[in-house]
């Protein structure tokens, strides 16, 4: 039986109309696939093996990547679930040398401020094993920068604003899928979050209704790329199972 929903303000109904799922357009769940248990395990094993190879890279090759690869990865990101299906994200793909240079210059201003004044000693100590500093040459070396924006609200054709629900969570989900898709294609990424990032709105011409979420650096790793010798937590350290 399909549950009904009565719209109320406090204890008083706004309307007598009761809404059910059948009141809205629906379509059959055509593309769902169920796999036999052994195949399910095998598929997950291969997926885990592949995704566990993903590493954050800070040394990129300037080798070009065909744009259609980036477009397909972005299409995958666009399938992410979102609050009320409002899809509150916008991706700006930057490949032009002039714009990448502007972004690097603005980002390094904020990064120098961070490392010299804003960051606490504890924060700097946490970053030390990663070997990061205020110099960000990868912002110009990598073939693509993808600036991810979250939209706090949308606009109807008549100019009215539409509130977006859970834009941070929704954009985070879409970005996670994007990173995974790019890794699956054989590309490396770096999530870069200089703070504040308002300069991205100015350089990329995005409206105030959009907030920079992060800057994704995308490309092939340099031939001699090195990454920090760090490890990931085992399952038992970040998971709890409750079966009663």
What are these regions (language model features)?
Residues 15-43, 133, 214-244:
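C-terminal helix-cap and adjacent tail motif
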Residues 20, 93-171:
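Glycine/small-residue-rich phosphate/adenosyl-binding loop
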Residues 5-57, 61-71, 117:
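N-terminal accessory segments that position/regulate proteins before the catalytic core
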Residues 84-95:
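Short loop-to-beta-strand entry elements in the cores of soluble alpha/beta enzymes
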Residues 76-78, 129-134, 200-202, 225:
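Glycine-rich, charged/polar anion/phosphate-binding loops
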Residues 200-213:
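Short, electropositive alpha-helical surface patch
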Residues 78-84:
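Glycine-rich phosphate/pyrophosphate-binding beta-alpha loops
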Residues 73-77, 146, 152-203:
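Small-aliphatic-rich amphipathic alpha-helix that forms the alpha element of a beta-alpha
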């Amino acid at each position: 039986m399909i549950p009904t929903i009565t719209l109320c303000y406090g204890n008083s109904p706004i309307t007598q109309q009761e809404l059910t799922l059948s009141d809205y357009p629906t379509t059959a769940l055509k593309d769902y696939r169920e796999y036999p248990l052994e195949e399910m395990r095998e598929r997950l094993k291969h997926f885990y093996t592949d995704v566990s190879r993903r590493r954050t890279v800070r040394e990129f090759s300037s080798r070009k990547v065909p744009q259609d690869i980036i477009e397909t990865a972005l299409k995958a990101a666009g399938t992410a679930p979102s609050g009320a299906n409002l899809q509150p994200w916008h991706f700006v793909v930057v490949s032009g040398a002039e714009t990448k240079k502007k972004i690097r210059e603005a980002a390094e201003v904020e990064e120098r401020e961070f490392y010299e004044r804003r960051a606490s000693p504890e924060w700097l100590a946490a970053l030390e094993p990663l070997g990061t500093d205020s110099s960000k040459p990868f912002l110009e070396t990598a073939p693509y920068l993808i600036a991810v924006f979250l939209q706090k609200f949308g606009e109807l054709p008549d100019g009215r604003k539409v509130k977006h629900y859970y834009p941070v969570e929704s954009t985070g989900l879409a970005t996670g899928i994007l990173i995974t898709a790019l890794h699956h294609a054989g590309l490396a990424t770096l999530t870069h979050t200089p703070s504040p990032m308002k300069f991205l709105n100015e350089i990329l011409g995005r409206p105030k209704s959009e907030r920079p979420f992060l800057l994704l650096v995308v490309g092939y790793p340099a031939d001699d790329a090195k990454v920090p010798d760090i490890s990931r937590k085992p399952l038992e350290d970040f998971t709890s199972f409750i079966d009663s």
